[in-house]
Amino acid sequence: MKGKRFTSPEKRFHFIYPEDWETLVVEDIPAFFHPEMGGVLQIYSFAHKVGNVDSMTELKNYISVHEIEFNEELVATFTNSEGTNILSCEFKKEDRHWCVYAISNQNKLLIATFNSDIDIDDKTYKILASIISSVQFLK
């Protein structure tokens, strides 16, 4: 995918997103979107001071905030070329479609959320997979 590189302000991670997408930072949370699509990708960054991240627990915690019943059997798991663990799940709530990703490597964690008021099509899923797979932790 041709794209632009986003590097977090604290230099913890970077990834590639489509060059025709725009970016906006709201309350220190970067958001990425195509101006003609009905959704937005937001990236939340965390680091544990002690011990490694338990991605499944972090994903479950995020889902529970939205009062969604968590079902671990519906979580997809994969690893990118950097050895970064990625968990993915999706849900619908109040006419919004959500894709949530927990991306971790040792003590570092990103929660990436894409939410849209329209159903997510195959093209968008592929774009999201490319973005998420391109994540590299820097520190």
Regions inferred by a protein language model and the residue ranges of each:
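Generic beta-strand structural signal
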Residues: 23-25, 104-105, 137
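Short C-terminal domain-edge/linker segments immediately following a structured domain
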Residues: 36-38, 46-47, 53-55, 63-65, ...
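Signature of long, low-cysteine stretches enriched in small and polar/charged residues
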Residues: 60-108, 115-118, 129
